[in-house]
């Protein structure tokens, strides 16, 4: 006993002093976990010598990093992870060093038994995994297992049925062929880089593939012809309606079509010796009674008016001026 006490004092007396000094510093400084910080200061050699001296007969346990609080949190996180990832096939846990596949399966069963929601989520996920299939554009499945190919016309968005097929790939190929016929290079295809359709469709006989192509081409051709006929009928109806409206407007206003000679109304003013001629008409100066006469604008009414229109006064032709009356002007100047 005395020898063992001497060995302990000789080997660990300096280490204990170091631990005391570091412990006071750690407590004053503070940190996430005091125990982890304390034992992290020891070197691996000192820890190994201590374990071999005190536990010579017992084998050392597997090393675990962190304190008991950390391990507890790790277990809780692992449990939550397994509950959220409730699927049919077991997956390795987050920390594979402490758990094996047998423990993960047991934890999954416990989570399913503890919460019905987890069991329902596991069943739903398993159903999604087993029933997940590839979806194609323009293809839908009947409830009895057959596959239907459909496409919409770019003109009026009308749905066209392309046929019923045994496989989804055959229906997708029918849609691709119809889409290329309608839209050309702008079509969105299920198999844009397909070279040999027989390999994809699984048709050993080429006659089936040819029959599929002919059926789709005939369907698209007939639909396009029907759309053209409907457009032609609509255009004919529109033209007939426009012509009928034009005829009715012409019949309601016949005066537009009739042409009459253009005449001008002139008013003359008659007096004893002179006349006042204007394009607006003839008017009597003595009686001041207007007399309306319809006379063509190109031919003068009388010879006197023609002579009067030719009168030249000081080099200016004043025949068409409304105030032209030479006798009245001289009378005014004399007075």
UniProtKB/Swiss-Prot annotation:
- Which PROSITE patterns would you find in this protein's record? AP2_ERF
Specify where it is mainly localized: nucleus
What is the annotated signal peptide range for this record? Answer: none
Q: Name one Pfam family in it.
A: AP2
Q: Tell me which InterPro entries the record gives.
A: AP2/ERF_dom, AP2/ERF_dom_sf, DNA-bd_dom_sf, ERF/AP2-like
Q: Which residues bind DNA?
A: 135-192
Q: What is the lineage of its organism?
A: Eukaryota, Viridiplantae, Streptophyta, Embryophyta, Tracheophyta
Gene Ontology cellular component? nucleus
The free-text function statement in the UniProt record for this protein reads:
Probably acts as a transcriptional activator. Binds to the GCC-box pathogenesis-related promoter element. May be involved in the regulation of gene expression by stress factors and by components of stress signal transduction pathways.
Q: Keywords for this entry?
A: Activator, DNA-binding, Ethylene signaling pathway, Nucleus, Transcription, Transcription regulation
Known SMART domains for this protein?
A: AP2 (SM00380)
Q: Where is this region: Disordered?
A: 244-264
One GO term under biological process is: ethylene-activated signaling pathway
What would you give as a GO molecular function for this chain, any one?
Answer: transcription cis-regulatory region binding
Q: Which family does it belong to?
A: Belongs to the AP2/ERF transcription factor family. ERF subfamily.
Name the chain's protein.
Ethylene-responsive transcription factor ERF061
What subcellular locations does the record give?
A: Nucleus
């Amino acid at each position: 006993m005395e020898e063992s006490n001497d060995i302990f004092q000789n080997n660990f007396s300096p280490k204990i002093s170091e631990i005391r000094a570091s412990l006071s510093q750690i407590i004053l400084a503070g940190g996430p976990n005091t125990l982890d910080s304390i034992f992290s200061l020891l070197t691996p050699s000192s820890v190994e010598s201590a374990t071999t001296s005190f536990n010579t007969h017992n084998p050392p346990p597997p090393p675990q990093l962190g304190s008991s609080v950390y391990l507890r949190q790790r277990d809780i996180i692992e449990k939550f992870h397994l509950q959220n990832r409730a699927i049919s096939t077991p997956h390795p846990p987050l920390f594979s060093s402490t758990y094996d596949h047998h423990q993960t399966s047991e934890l999954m069963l416990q989570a399913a038994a503890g919460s019905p929601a987890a069991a329902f989520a596991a069943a739903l996920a398993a159903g999604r995994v087993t029933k997940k299939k590839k979806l194609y554009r323009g293809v839908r499945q009947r409830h009895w297992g057959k596959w239907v190919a459909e496409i919409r016309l770019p003109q009026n968005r009308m749905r066209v049925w392309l046929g019923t097929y045994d496989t989804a790939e055959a229906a997708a190929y029918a849609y691709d062929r119809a889409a290329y016929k309608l839209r050309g290079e702008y079509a969105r295809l299920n198999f844009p880089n397909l070279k040999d359709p027989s390999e994809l469709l699984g048709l050993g006989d080429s006659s089936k593939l040819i029959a599929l192509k002919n059926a789709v081409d005939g369907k698209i051709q007939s639909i396009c012809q029907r759309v053209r006929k409907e457009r032609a009928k609509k255009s004919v109806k529109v033209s007939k309606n426009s012509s009928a409206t034009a005829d009715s407007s012409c019949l309601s206003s016949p005066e537009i079509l009739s042409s009459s000679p253009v005449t001008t109304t002139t008013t003359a003013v008659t007096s004893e010796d002179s006349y006042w001629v204007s394009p607006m008409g003839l008017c009597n100066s003595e009686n001041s009674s207007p007399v309306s006469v319809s006379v063509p604008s190109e031919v003068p009414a009388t010879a006197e008016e023609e002579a009067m229109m030719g009168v030249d006064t000081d080099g200016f032709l004043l025949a068409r001026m409304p105030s032209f009356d030479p006798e009245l002007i001289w009378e005014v100047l004399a007075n």
